[in-house]
């Protein structure tokens, strides 16, 4: 597909029909994308088409791509989401040959129990058994109740904010996981973990059984900036090597965040995939 063809495709927001799954497992390691990577594209259809062009066969759906554009409507939407439309999203990925592996729905302290439960009902409508969540630590007991009820794994996502009620440190996950069901787990962002001055390789080796997905990005230590893969301090190659040699069944989802205005999202995510493939070769 040429760049001109892709531009036409994204403008029309049409997904290419696919009859076979996209193969993006390299040396036994699943490489996919958090669809937040494609936040600058005009629609979810354009995101799916981009993943097809790049050759990414695993997706973690960012809820920002399906939430109402009018922020004043978001709370009501979370209470009563359009389930028929959400089921249709699964079909978009299936038709494109992409495994919709997880749904990103971030539970917060201010959510009602009904809004928390709707996240699990949306996951079921999407046909996924895993949710990733940028959440408050204190909401985890309420979430765990529904995770166990619906038998859906929740992986809590980390940043490097170091705020006491956010996930940044190993102790934050310990607080959330201790005493919870097997369905409460970890979505380890190796870039943010490095920026917070922790080692993602040793953490992966110690806690792999609780890790739902990995987010692959590169950052500098000491809360430094996002960088193109290979230019920061994150030991991406070490993480991928552990997945390869230990055969952990954990997908590594590229999360492209270093982009600046004017950069070509599709071209940059292709570079990210190329880096991962080279690291695994």
Regions picked out by a protein language model, each given a short descriptive name:
Residues 4-32, 39-58, 167-170, 174-188, ...:
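Histidine-acidic metal/acid-base catalytic patches
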